Amino acid sequence: MKMKKLAVFFAAAALTTVTAAGCSGGQKETAADAAKDSEAVTTAEQTTGAKTEVPETTAEAAEAAAEADEENYDTGDASKDNARNQDGIGENELLVVSFGTSYNDSRRLTIGAIEDAVEKAFPDFAVRRGFTSQIIIDHVKSRDNVAIDNVGEALDRAEKNGVRNLVIQPTHLMNGLEYTDLVNEAAEYSDAFDKVAIGKPLLTTEDDFRAVRKAVTETTAQYDDGKTAICFMGHGTEAESNQVYEKMQDMLTEAGYKNYYVGTVEAAPSLDDVLAAVEEGSYKKVVLEPLMIVAGDHANNDMAGDEEGSWKTAFEDAGYEVTCLVNGLGQLEAIQQLFVEHAQAAVDSLTK
């Protein structure tokens, strides 16, 4: 029985091929402890030679299934998106890992744009893609005949192509369970490469929060007329890491953005919480925008949908004029560059 050790540094997790055990820590593209710049975590993990698949949680599966069921409108041309599943990788690979989305245009404009930015920044690395949602992968394959690697397939591809130095950069919003799953799965391959480093998620340090605050306030500045409430919808989680939404709210308020509100679909602050907070003001208009990397099912339906229960209809029923901005954070150049910075820290850690 082999035991492996995986050291995870949130500033830039450097993984070396040594003997001992796996890893742990966080939740999907939904929540994170405001992690320390540098933290090592280890966990014992048995391996039998076969690579294991990380199952989706019930919530993740439900989200992916809901997205896969949305066939009432065109989500864009899948052929315009680069699945980045080619061989001929070379010795250096930068694997960008995302939950994924079956919304073709959003996938290209968010995840694809992040991958493009990373590719431009690291010409000595071949950039490849891995999704964590098998349901989305299967749906895109069935509907559009586009093959996207899951994380295990992407790691297998890297190993078969003789990659020696592997950097994994997640596009997760926060350090949560899905980030932990990624670290654990990468641990199973720690003896397949000379060096492995895992970059940190979007919201990890104080500087990250400030950078995201700056990005989202700048992109909504045209609506900030003093008469409009600007509300961001995150995913949310019941895990402790859900506190990052409160942290983002506090940072917005402290910076003087008192008409900016942060809520979630799955946890607190809820839609009711955000609506109640907005009603304490004297606003006539409301702008809704997702606080998510992609604009998928949650953004198009839970936020901007016309059916009862959506954020849009709830605010309209309360008498507000509502504008929905169905854009993922990944479309913003500032967010793309923040992921590049995180990837740079991971790349730099390979030589330490």
Q: Where are these predicted regions, by residue range?
A:
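Repetitive helical segments and hydrophobic/amphipathic motifs
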Residues: 13-14
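Active-site-proximal alpha-helix that buttresses catalytic centers in soluble enzyme cores
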Residues: 25, 29-30, 48-352
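Glycine-centered signal
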Residues: 1, 41, 49-52
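Polybasic, lysine/arginine-rich low-complexity segments
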Residues: 4-5, 28, 36, 51
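Pyridoxal 5′-phosphate
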Residues: 33
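Short extracytoplasmic/periplasmic juxtamembrane "stem" segments immediately C-terminal to an N-terminal membrane anchor
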Residues: 36-45
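C-terminal motif of bacterial Sec signal peptides marking the signal peptidase cleavage site
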Residues: 18-22
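Bacterial Sec-dependent N-terminal signal peptides
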Residues: 1-10
